[in-house]
Amino acid sequence: MNSELFSPYTIKDVTLKNRIVMSPMCMYSSENEDGQVTNFHLIHYGTRAAGQVGLVMIEATAVLPEGRISNKDLGIWDDSLIEGLHKTTTFIHDNGAKAAIQLAHAGRKAELETDALAPSAVPFNETMKIPVEMSIHQIKNTILAFQQAAIRSKQAGFDVIEIHGAHGYLINEFLSPLSNKRTDEYGGSPENRYRFLREIIDSINEVWNGPLFVRISANDYHPDGLTVQDYVQYTKWMKEQGVDLIDCSSGAVVPARIDVYPGYQVQYAKHIKEHANIATGAVGLITTGAQAEQILNNNEADLIFIGRELLRNPYFPRIAANELGFELEEPHQYERAPGKISTNK
């Protein structure tokens, strides 16, 4: 039986063997608090590759040490961090998948002893510290850090880079009027609020010619915040700059009540795909092969990002293939266990 979920997908010169992407999820497992990859990361990501995920995306990886969410985040701010990341991509490639990395800066959501940096001195909520408004020098230094992180990503063997522009972290904070109260060239109008991301994309394009994704929060869930229609314009600009795919998440720039249900964010991937004419990834409570297949068949997205379901079951692609009646090519080491496996949870 044919399956869209298990059909290949090519972006630039990178071909994924199927449309399943491991969504970036922080593991907070750099135990020495130095940003280094540990044995856990190798097993964690290598297992999902062996489980037949098409693209394994490494968790949010900090471009600067002060840009970590926690002290145990992975980092890519120094050349000494390349070796561990290269071991990770080797694990992933050796097990048949492509490797991606999400480059990130936590902004005002950094829970470190040092000052949190943000576009404006506006805290996320009343329990978090008031961030320091970034100077122009700090903004330019952060843009340079993203560029240097892209260079290190290439040296580490990654096939795809994703810029983390979602979930209330630094780039999202610049984009949203709820967190960006600046009156200079990086605040005010949509064009000015986009400037920080624009300059990051431009800087990465100078050193990286592989597939480039951006994760967005397509809805602020606040009457004075951004909606998916605002992101249509933003993503049109991203496409003009050469971004290849928009990973469509939502929320978390301010505290908000969100109506969560299976596939609740697919609508954003569909809207951006249709109105900005750019490839999209759907993410959020996608838990079955049939659900993922329907999203692709309905042309609502191009890739399916799976998060928690891959934490519950690293071999989710096998279950999805069984569900869809698709014969999945197994690693030769597992050929002694042919046939269907249980889909019971």
Swiss-Prot record:
KW Oxidoreductase (keyword) present: yes
UniProt EC number: 1.6.99.1
Domain of life: Bacteria
GO biological process, alphabetically ordered: response to toxic substance
Alphabetized GO MF terms: FMN binding; NADP binding; NADPH dehydrogenase activity
The protein's name in its UniProt record: NADPH dehydrogenase
Gene3D superfamilies assigned: Aldolase class I
Cofactor(s), by name: FMN
UniProt feature coiled coil, ranges: none
Catalysed reactions listed for this entry: A + NADPH + H(+) = AH2 + NADP(+)
